[in-house]
Amino acid sequence: MIETIRKLAEAYGPSGREEDVHRIILEELKNHIDGYKFDRVGNLIVWKDGKSGKKVMLDAHSDEIGLVVTNIDKNGFLRVETVGGVPPHPYVGQRVKFPQCTGIVYVEGETSQDMKKNFSNLSFDVMYVDIGASSYEEAQKVAPIGTFGVYDSRFMQNGDFLTSKAMDDRVGCAVVIEVLKRLNSPNNTVYCSFSTQEEIGLMGARVAGYDIMPEACIAIDVTASSDTPKAFKRHAMVLKKGPAIKVKDRASISDRKIVDKLIELAEESGIPYQMEVLTMGGTNAAAFQATASGIASATVSIPTRYVHTPSETVHLDDIKNCVNLLIEYVQKGV
């Protein structure tokens, strides 16, 4: 499973450009699913047939945050904007990978006072990307306006701690893949959406829900942990204590029956878990809840350190226990 996470996390896949990620997912799921399709917004939807006639859905978004080229100056430096909700600070001094080149993000300033002011009031208005070009024409050949880029960081393992860009939400994709690999003759038909464009507003999920209309849906995503020095103490989520069963975030309140069933199954099976109330953000569960007349939806999260940085960090035990809990749910929860 670690190798699957590595391949997914290192893949290039900003919002709207998820094709490489989907290719890896289909390679991993060969001989483990009964069918798959792509919809018109690029969602990859796979399924495993069950016996009950009921449909349960798991969702993990396949996109990652990134940057998009908005302008190129006469000396070949790129101006950029975010793809997804991320502040500028994690990008300073970082490498960014575009399909045909790699660049370095930095901050402009003509004097030391300029630099100090720009660092203090950091925004993409005063940042640029250096791709080693010397002119507009040279840069235009490899990174024209509209080109998407992502962090250029590599997977790292420290014991059972796993670190990479794009754990949000490639670790969720890996969880869903493992669930499908381990499910034999499921009771319920299990649909899984590897949805697109979550980071810019849950766009893929808004479509996938209408397509499947399951009895219940669980989004698998990351959540910010509070176990680092001076972390946000209103959050209870930590690494190594199991998947987090979400009650609420800023975008949705999880279906109470699903939450109660997840707790019941975890306790019956001895699966460690923790409860989550997130004071920010949201997941695809919000989009599924607003689909047609509504889909009962909830989120199960992987606690994660350093979300939306090049070094998002998760723990293998939480991932494995998330898989175990979801297998119990898709078999018994609906």
Place the predicted regions along the sequence by residue.
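N-terminal hydrophobic/helix-forming segments and targeting peptides
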Residues: 1-334
